[in-house]
A protein has these predicted regions:
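HAMP signal relay modules and closely related sensory coiled-coil linkers
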Residues: 1-11, 24-39
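Short alpha-helical segment of the dimerization/phosphotransfer core of two-component systems
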Residues: 107-112
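Conserved micro-motifs of the catalytic ATP-binding
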Residues: 127-132, 170-173
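Short beta-strand/loop element within the Bergerat-fold HATPase_c
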Residues: 196-208
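Conserved glycine-rich
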Residues: 262-263
Length: 300
């Protein structure tokens, strides 16, 4: 038995952590020793696997953060360069229309402020800061979102539909953040479709979930773009977000906020057939009532 123990120990020392010593009768000293050693080896293997997994996650997180900082720096550089250029024209007295020049500077500064706000929100979500939770009626939020969208684009046909389903679309969530989810989805539909494209906001229930949908009959997206549309700073058209005043983070924020609420967001689309963004959230009736105590988030 000792020779077999020695061979197993050598194999483990060489990195074969799945090796075990032979089992002997548990009533013998050798049997009890083999049982104890195998238990210890199993714990070591689990600990090493956990450490490797944590290290891999840390590397992935570091890579994502590095890419995020690179993208953010690039996006911030664009409005800064524009502001600097117009400011230099003003300093040199080369601009004929000073009002237009100052308006462009103000516009770029405003866009940069929106970008910084979006970046700070994503940083909070990445850090898993707690949300301020309460009961939220999604029907009321959807109605407000449709009303606001009509005010934003009065020429467009924007409708609200209630989906058939059991119960009410009430969830446990942060009302201001859920309003932002709807606001971003509706703004995305309006900004990236022609005025002739209808936009429909739907709300209801499906099984244990509350459902929100924002659909349009615009040009749609390719499946390749649909797979990446929730990535940060990803644009199906590299010029479209800048042309419409967006930051390229709206759908990423939707994805992160929905995930923070324990839900999921998907998109159904095809070229020439419009887009339908669908948000599924757990209904409040299925949440432990003890968890309804509001959680106040810490400072950013």
């Amino acid at each position: 038995p000792l020779a077999e123990f020695e061979q197993t120990a050598a194999a483990i020392g060489a990195g074969q952590l799945d090796r075990r010593v032979p089992q002997w009768h548990p009533r013998t000293e050798v049997g009890r020793l083999s049982l104890a050693l195998n238990g210890m080896l199993a714990q070591i293997q689990r600990a090493v696997a956990s450490a490797e997994s944590s290290a891999e996650k840390a590397r992935d997180s570091e890579d994502r953060m590095r890419q995020f900082i690179t993208d953010a720096s690039h996006e911030l550089r664009t409005p800064l360069t524009t502001i600097r250029g117009f400011a230099e024209l003003y300093r040199q007295g080369a601009a004929r229309d000073v009002g237009m020049l100052l308006s462009r500077i103000e516009s770029e500064a405003s866009r940069m402020g929106l970008l910084v706000d979006d970046l700070l929100l994503l940083a909070r979500l990445d850090a898993h800061r707690p949300l301020e939770l309460c009961r939220v009626d999604l029907l009321a939020l959807a109605s407000d979102a449709a009303h606001d969208a009509r005010a934003m684009d009065p020429k467009r046909r924007i409708t609200l539909e209630v989906l058939d389903g059991p119960g009410t679309p009430e969830v446990l969530g942060d009302e201001s953040r859920l309003r932002q989810v709807l606001r971003n989805l509706v703004a995305n539909a309006i900004q990236h479709t022609p005025e002739s494209a209808d936009v429909t906001v739907r709300v209801g229930t499906e099984g244990d979930d509350a459902i929100l949908e924002v659909a349009d009959d615009g040009p749609g997206m390719s499946q390749e773009d649909a797979l990446r549309v929730f990535e940060r700073f990803y644009r199906a058209d590299s010029s479209r977000a800048r042309a419409s005043g967006g930051t390229g983070l709206g759908l990423s924020i939707v994805d992160s906020l929905v995930a923070a609420h324990g839900g999921a967001v998907t998109v159904t689309t095809a070229l020439g057939e419009g887009c339908c963004f669908r948000v599924s959230l757990p209904r409040v009736s299925d949440v432990d009532q003890l968890s309804l105590t509001p959680v106040v988030p810490g400072p950013p």
